[in-house]
Amino acid sequence: MTNEDHKYINLLLEKNLIKSSCLEVGSAEDWCSLVPKFNNQGIKTIGSDLSKGKYVDHIIDFESDIKDIIPILQDETPFQTILCLNVLEHTFNPIQILDNLIQLLDSGGKLILIAPAAWPLHGYPIDCWRLMPDFYTKYAELRNLTIDKNLFRYLGFGPVDSYKKPHSSGFPLPLRKGLYFYYSKLIHKIFNTNGRNHLFSNHIAIGLVMTKN
């Protein structure tokens, strides 16, 4: 969880979009799990992961068949809120995971996602995907879900729609701050080269809220 991730989650809390009962997918790392925070705020929350952890109530592989998942969670479902934060990039079949999570949501429930669109590789244990805005838009269309456009954001930059161009979803430009940025820019100008970090940021995550219709 980055600072921008936390800001996004706090925004959703302010808007009262995170409600009981809630499931956090990927809660094994106790330093970044939201289970204690939500429970302390009166939002009944349980955690799940592939391995044991302080805030893991159920060990579940969400890439498995939904028939194997439902019996594990039968006493808790359906959920009003499911959070899947910084998980999808570490899976082989993110669509299978999303399909399973949607089936665990109540009608009108919220699926909250955060995943990188541009980010250095970081295996945990594997790193497979960088999901673009069009992926979420198409998925929501095919599964009859509604994306809140005001909350469909490049975290730390702004709404995804504000960066769209004809025939392109668009990426935020790098934040132009810090001595290193200007030093690097000068060096690239002297040697007539193009620095990748001057074309677009190499740390971009997308946050969004999908509602089950």
Regions found by a protein language model. Give the residues of each.
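Class I SAM-dependent methyltransferase Rossmann-like catalytic core
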Residues: 1-17
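S-adenosyl-L-methionine-dependent methyltransferase catalytic module, highlighting the catalytic core
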Residues: 92-106, 110-213
